[in-house]
From Swiss-Prot:
Membrane topology, record value: Peripheral membrane protein
Keywords for this protein: ATP synthesis, ATP-binding, CF(1), Hydrogen ion transport, Ion transport, Membrane, Nucleotide-binding, Thylakoid, Translocase, Transport
Listed EC numbers: 7.1.2.2
GO MF entry, a single one: ATP hydrolysis activity
PROSITE patterns referenced in this protein's UniProt entry, alphabetically: ATPASE_ALPHA_BETA
Gene transcribed to yield this protein: atpD
PANTHER family: ATP SYNTHASE, ATP SYNTHASE SUBUNIT BETA, MITOCHONDRIAL
Protein name: ATP synthase subunit beta
SUPFAM superfamilies (alphabetical): C-terminal domain of alpha and beta subunits of F1 ATP synthase, N-terminal domain of alpha and beta subunits of F1 ATP synthase, P-loop containing nucleoside triphosphate hydrolases
Reaction(s) catalysed (UniProt annotation): ATP + H2O + 4 H(+)(in) = ADP + phosphate + 5 H(+)(out)
Positions annotated to bind ATP: G164, G165, A166, G167, V168, G169, K170, T171
Subunit structure: F-type ATPases have 2 components, CF(1) - the catalytic core - and CF(0) - the membrane proton channel. CF(1) has five subunits: alpha(3), beta(3), gamma(1), delta(1), epsilon(1). CF(0) has four main subunits: a(1), b(1), b'(1) and c(9-12).
Functional description taken from the UniProt entry: Produces ATP from ADP in the presence of a proton gradient across the membrane. The catalytic sites are hosted primarily by the beta subunits.
Length: 486
């Protein structure tokens, strides 16, 4: 699965130097491989164990030598070993056969489920779609999750930054989005694990199986393909695994003409790996030690994530902010490409409000009247101003109590608490934990529901009726039930 074979006889070279994950290979005159070609080394180490290693050509050094970056460990590699030019970039399997499977950067399955049953492969390096092929009209991507659709709507073919610490519900939110795109949009998802913990990758896989996102009995019914280059792998693998996942997503968009969700966890690790490789190749570092090609590297990945006339790739990227410094070149470069940000707040998770999306910190470029319409825009802004006022009043309530507020402020607090509760909803993928059936809420139902709360039409209903429900009809039914129980 490493590369498509070239038509001429493959050129063979000899390893002349190995420094960590970087190796220099000498080829015969006139037989030098191209930049980004995959080199394959298959040999035995001094202990008699098999070595099978792929490296990507990064530099042509002169004197018939090339410098390549290994995609796996270089343990046991010695000078004099033979390296073969595959004549093509690293290529990975694509199509339906990838669903439910876990791959490494080279497109090799690592889930012990046997070989991948497909002959379709695609190179991980390709150009972004031409301007004439792009869908330029902004279109909202409905997720069925109230808080996202109302306050920070996603753009179809856009890029979303997902911010949140440990244990606030990132994984569950990702699972729900994968589930909803499959059921409501007939789309599939690709998950790229870039430089994160192997344990987290394994946990995610097990949770996907538990929630039905991966069907272990019939993999063809699965809704996601996974591609991992984890923290313990060499920088070459971490730098390229995002492109491997993106290539799988592009096939679903361009060939199957589907809407695809691409998850990248974590986009910062992609930049970090590029920085390591850049230093190993001897390039002069730029600001804060990052690679001088930072903008180019990030742009090459991000520009391929887009809507075309055939389909779309909507990307949700977890963003780690080093030392919480938003001016660090890595997150700052990433922000330039994002259309929306979804911020998960620990305070909301502590209150039991799931999804714990912060309604005041989350933003979207789509939230403007010309895109979402006047009604949606006005409703969203009214919800945010009500919640903002409630936030301002919380200190007064804590010191003096609710009774000291004016009648108008008491009403604002009451409605804000209902809004906060109504922003929660039960998830399909969490049914096994909550015992409540999941809800997909249409955008028009979401807008209508919040308008009714803001207009005071539901002031007489108890606050608890708004918690973990779908639309307003369910609120009313729950209120009746609470009334009967009393």
């Amino acid at each position: 699965m490493v590369a498509t074979p070239s038509t001429s006889a493959p050129a063979k070279g000899v390893v002349r130097q190995v420094i960590g994950p970087v190796l220099d290979v000498e080829f015969p005159a006139g037989k030098l491989p191209k930049i980004l070609n995959a080199l394959r080394i298959e040999a035995k180490n001094p202990a008699g164990q098999d070595i099978a290693l792929t490296a990507e050509v990064q530099q042509l050094l002169g004197d018939h030598r090339v410098r390549a970056v290994a995609m796996s460990g270089t343990d046991g590699l010695v000078r004099g070993m033979e390296a073969t030019d595959t004549g093509a970039p690293i290529s990975v399997p694509v199509g339906e056969a990838t669903l439910g499977r876990i791959f490494n950067v080279l497109g090799e399955p690592v889930d012990e489920q046997g070989p991948v049953n497909t002959s379709d492969i695609a190179p991980i390096h390709r150009s972004a779609p031409k301007l004439t092929d792009l869908e330029t009209k902004p279109k909202v991507f409905e997720t069925g999750i109230k808080v996202i659709d109302l306050l920070a709507p996603y753009r179809q073919g856009g890029k979303v930054g997902l911010f949140g610490g440990a244990g606030v519900g990132k994984t569950v939110l990702i699972q729900e989005l994968i589930n909803n795109i499959a059921k409501e949009h007939g789309g599939v998802s690709v998950f790229g694990g870039v430089g994160e913990r192997t344990r987290e990758g394994n946990d995610l896989y097990e949770e996907f199986k538990e929630s039905g996102v991966i069907n272990a009995d019939d993999l063809s019914q699965s809704k996601v393909a996974l591609c991992f280059g984890q923290m313990n792998e060499p920088p070459g693998a971490r730098m390229r695994v995002g492109l491997s996942a993106l290539t799988m997503a592009e096939h679903f968009r361009d060939v199957n003409k589907q809407d695809v969700l691409l998850f990248v966890d974590n986009i910062f690790r992609f930049v970090q790996a590029g920085s390591e490789v850049s230093a190993l190749l001897g390039r002069m570092p730029s600001a804060v030690g990052y690679q001088p090609t930072l903008g180019t590297d990030v742009g090459a990945l991000q520009e391929r994530i887009t809507s075309t006339l055939e389909g779309s790739i909507t990307s949700i990227q977890a963003v780690y902010v080093p030392a919480d410094d938003l001016t660090d070149p890595a997150p700052a470069t990433t922000f330039a490409h994002l259309d929306a940000t979804t911020v998960l707040a620990r305070g909301l998770a502590a209150k039991g409000i799931y999804p714990a999306v912060d309604p005041l910190d989350s933003t979207s470029t789509m939230l403007q009247p010309s895109v979402v319409g006047d009604e949606h825009y006005k409703t969203a802004r009214a919800v945010q101003s009500t919640l903002q006022r409630y936030k301002e009043l919380q200190d007064i309530i804590a010191i003096l109590g609710l009774d000291e507020l004016s009648e108008e402020d008491r009403l604002t607090v009451s409605r804000a608490r209902k809004i906060e509760k109504f922003l929660s909803q039960p998830f399909f993928v969490a049914e096994i934990f909550t015992g409540m059936s999941g809800k997909y809420v249409k955008l028009e139902d979401t807008i209508a529901g919040f308008n009714m709360i803001l207009a005071g039409e539901l002031d007489d209903l108890p606050e608890q009726a708004f918690y973990l429900v779908g639309n307003i009809d369910e609120v009313k039914a729950k209120a009746e039930k609470i009334k009967e129980e009393k």
